[in-house]
């Protein structure tokens, strides 16, 4: 019996000593770029990535070849991006919120622009200044499209959501006291086909549901926990939402809702062993979820050496074990 116990103990030790490898990564070389946004283009079979340091927009092939699609230092930093529903344009948010190599007092926390780029040529097709919509500081962070082609944009410093119609008309869509917080507020945003937006707040970890037809109707989504450090969002299905969390946690979570997002519960997450490095945003490749590792933790280290390589990493969400019912083994 003693020998048997020792055998099983040895097997457990061996299993514990086997290192769990991180999930698949697409590594690419783009020195000092620090990409925050990522968007997959199913037509061109490429990923597009932004740059918080250089303000450029890059293209990454599935095998990790990087090339610059659009470069303009006046953009300062580029953040959230989405391939337009027409499949021909890439919409990108540009500003000077924090990490730009080209920052200056005239634009620092003042600039917020929505750029439209031709995917075929890399040329800029549109450039919309949103800074006059709300006075004060600005940080254009993320965006979502509805089924009519309207664009909804989060401004993390102005605590507002803007709406840009297909003809380029910009307006304040929603601004509520509940959005207000210190530091980075509203961030990730998705459109739900039932006719509402879901938005997260980085500093508070709260989610909000906002009615498209009545944007004054802002509701907190009841959660079983808060997701402080919440960044990008991705709607996987009408009942499932992926939340990217960074700032020390560096994990990806999936929430599920059974009541049309009045409330939601945590249902799955990635593993610590996946070792995401300041994950920021998510995109879909077929049925898979891929995450941009922004590495922003390096930008607050004054002694750090700027990275040359970055990675888009596959998120494998593991279902959480269901809690046992009371009174049952």
Language-model region placement:
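Beta-rich, blade/repeat-based domains predominating
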Residues: 30-44, 52, 74-98, 131-151, ...
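Short loop/turn segments immediately following the C-termini of beta-strands
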Residues: 52, 95-97, 156-158, 202, ...
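Structural signal for beta-propeller blades
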Residues: 55-58, 99-100, 114, 159-162, ...
